[in-house]
Amino acid sequence: MKNQLRGPPARAHMSTSGAAAAGGTRAGSEPGAGSGSGAGTGAGAATGAGAMPCKSAEWLQEELEARGGASLLLLDCRPHELFESSHIETAINLAIPGLMLRRLRKGNLPIRSIIPNHADKERFATRCKAATVLLYDEATAEWQPEPGAPASVLGLLLQKLRDDGCQAYYLQGGFNKFQTEYSEHCETNVDSSSSPSSSPPTSVLGLGGLRISSDCSDGESDRELPSSATESDGSPVPSSQPAFPVQILPYLYLGCAKDSTNLDVLGKYGIKYILNVTPNLPNAFEHGGEFTYKQIPISDHWSQNLSQFFPEAISFIDEARSKKCGVLVHCLAGISRSVTVTVAYLMQKMNLSLNDAYDFVKRKKSNISPNFNFMGQLLDFERTLGLSSPCDNHASSEQLYFSTPTNHNLFPLNTLEST
């Protein structure tokens, strides 16, 4: 059994973003993605005046099959925690601290300096001019820079590499499209991170670990930059994510995509309801009749309005509770979208402020990291619920930093039985 939630599509910002639109459309499934071969050609490039050079997912698959990526230098421009969860084989992650974005825009930041791993840094230095350099973010499909529009991190890196004489392209459809079509060439490790833990940055709300600019930028232009930007300090989230879903309440579990496909885990915790907060991850046991599904088609991107789905998500979780079943709320890595829904549930059902609900979840799962604009939507939700919070002392900060992506962020609350 499955409930598919279909919301209004995300606003198109193809000059700065490749996020998949809401409404269930598969990320990166754009028409006309060409293919080709040859390390230095423009095979699969987008057409049209001013279009940025790209390669198709099919082209990359052929290169990996034929040469094992020997003639390629793959650069993953997504946030570190997404890279650790899953990435294309041989890829190097570019974790750009927010403060360095300004230097990158000014053109005085060597790309090599933002590669954290020494071996990867050397590999980049020796191969960037000889190999085809292919950059990818989460889901950029077709992209034409617009005069005066703010450049994405992907665009800044691509332009700098080409200015430096590199044969650089971006991957059409991004990681989402490639993983969907050629998952055999993706390395997945959603349970742990190989990077050392680091102290979370201090946020505007005082919420440790909040990704101030995961899907935005540094504080100056967080409304405009896309999901290819990194965390505010470029550091990885703590590597303490458990290899099983975390129990938030006796019936409510928070997890990742891998948890949703593990029958042993689902059976162990009595989970019969699964809330899938992604646009394209499949519901593994949908046709067996044993589980009840609801899918919220939202990407982890600044332009997405997750708050419009709060009432339905809360009702779904409560339905599981009323039937004395466990419910798993998951996204890809279990740190952003699913956390946002879980926090919203606690706020409404337990009358907790945003700070208190966030801290409640963080005590259970230390590596949570919702993107900044989802936090803005939770702040709107807090006001709608009439809850008090220390955040109320930061009214001016709300105006400066938060933007709800659509006009549908306010909604009549369902009459729900309190816990």
From Swiss-Prot:
Region (Disordered): 1-47, 216-240
InterPro entries the record matches: Dual-sp_phosphatase_cat-dom (IPR000340), MKP (IPR008343), Prot-tyrosine_phosphatase-like (IPR029021), Rhodanese-like_dom (IPR001763), Rhodanese-like_dom_sf (IPR036873), Tyr_Pase_dom (IPR000387), TYR_PHOSPHATASE_DUAL_dom (IPR020422)
Protein name: Dual specificity protein phosphatase 7
General function of this protein: Dual specificity protein phosphatase. Shows high activity towards MAPK1/ERK2. Also has lower activity towards MAPK14 and MAPK8. In arrested oocytes, plays a role in meiotic resumption. Promotes nuclear envelope breakdown and activation of the CDK1/Cyclin-B complex in oocytes, probably by dephosphorylating and inactivating the conventional protein kinase C (cPKC) isozyme PRKCB. May also inactivate PRKCA and/or PRKCG.
A Pfam family assignment: Rhodanese
Lineage per the UniProt record: Eukaryota, Metazoa, Chordata, Craniata, Vertebrata
PROSITE patterns, per database record: RHODANESE_3, TYR_PHOSPHATASE_2, TYR_PHOSPHATASE_DUAL
Keyword S-adenosyl-L-methionine in annotation: no
Domain Tyrosine-protein phosphatase: 244-387
Activity: how regulated: Strongly inhibited by sodium orthovanadate.
Protein family according to the UniProt entry: Belongs to the protein-tyrosine phosphatase family. Non-receptor class dual specificity subfamily.
Any Gene Ontology CC annotation: cytoplasm
Enzyme Commission designation: 3.1.3.16, 3.1.3.48
Quaternary structure annotation from Swiss-Prot or TrEMBL: Interacts with MAPK1/ERK2; the interaction enhances DUSP7 phosphatase activity.
GO molecular function, one term: protein tyrosine/threonine phosphatase activity
Active site as annotated: C331 (phosphocysteine intermediate)
Localization (cell): Cytoplasm
Isomerase as UniProt keyword: no
Gene that produces this protein: DUSP7
Bias (Low complexity): 10-29
Organism (species): Homo sapiens (Human)
Domain of life of the native organism: Eukaryota
Rhodanese domain segment(s): 68-187
Keywords, sorted A to Z: Cytoplasm, Hydrolase, Protein phosphatase
